[in-house]
């Protein structure tokens, strides 16, 4: 709209499972300070075509991140292709940490109570993960067993600690809830955070 002389930063915010669709309060706060904000709906969520899987969420985030760097997008929305941030809430934090490994050009990451989808399986509590899956009943083409198997197949790949090399020198903002019982800091994010603290 010509209100900013310099190209604007672009922020991509990914939603949780099935989560809050757009995190509108945060979106508007970012918009008011001059950011262009995208809140994509992953495959199978809120009317989007396709099936909702953790691996699809990562693929979707990669596709959106590459799209916002195209000349067409940058010209239309007056954004800086070198000032793109990726963030997410809960399972969207999982999406962010796994997608960022293939997006070394990101300016920064925003994690809000990130949920490590493989953690409960790795910690010997797969039934606790399965107990969460009925919440996805409203997702298109959703099958609890297929969803679980998609996560299970990514143990050792999607573990948060595997993101260390991608985030060790990255701008990172992580917001956690001290009383969060679904994605507790100690279990979900603290193992990676300790690795980052030890990084010189």
Regions picked out by a protein language model, each given a short descriptive name:
Residues 52-78:
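Alpha/beta-hydrolase active-site loop
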Residues 31-49:
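Conserved alpha/beta-hydrolase
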Residues 1-7:
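Short beta-strand-to-loop junctions in surface cap/lid or active-site-entrance loops
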Residues 98-147:
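Hydrolase active-site cap/lid region
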Residues 76-90:
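Alpha/beta-hydrolase fold nucleophile elbow
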Residues 17-28:
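The serine-hydrolase catalytic nucleophile loop
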Residues 7-16:
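Short beta-strand element of the alpha/beta-hydrolase
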Residues 147-200:
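Serine-hydrolase catalytic core
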């Amino acid at each position: 709209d010509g209100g900013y002389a310099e190209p604007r930063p672009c922020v991509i915010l990914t939603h949780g499972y099935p989560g809050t669709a757009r995190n509108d309060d945060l979106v508007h706060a970012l918009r008011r300070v001059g950011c262009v904000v995208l809140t994509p709906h992953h495959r199978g969520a809120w009317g989007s075509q396709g099936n909702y899987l953790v691996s699809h969420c990562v693929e979707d985030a990669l596709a959106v991140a590459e799209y916002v760097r195209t000349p067409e997008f940058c010209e239309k929305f007056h954004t800086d292709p070198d000032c793109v941030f990726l963030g997410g809430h809960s399972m969207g934090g999982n999406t962010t940490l796994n997608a960022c490994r293939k997006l070394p050009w990101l300016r920064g990451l925003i994690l809000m109570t990130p949920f490590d989808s493989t953690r409960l399986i790795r910690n010997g509590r797969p039934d606790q993960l399965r107990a969460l899956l009925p919440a996805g009943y409203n997702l298109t083409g959703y099958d609890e067993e297929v969803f679980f198997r998609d996560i299970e197949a990514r143990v050792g790949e999607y573990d948060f600690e595997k993101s260390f090399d991608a985030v060790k020198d990255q701008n990172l903002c992580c917001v956690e809830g001290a009383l969060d019982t679904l994605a507790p800091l100690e279990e979900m994010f603290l193992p990676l955070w300790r690795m980052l603290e030890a990084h010189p």
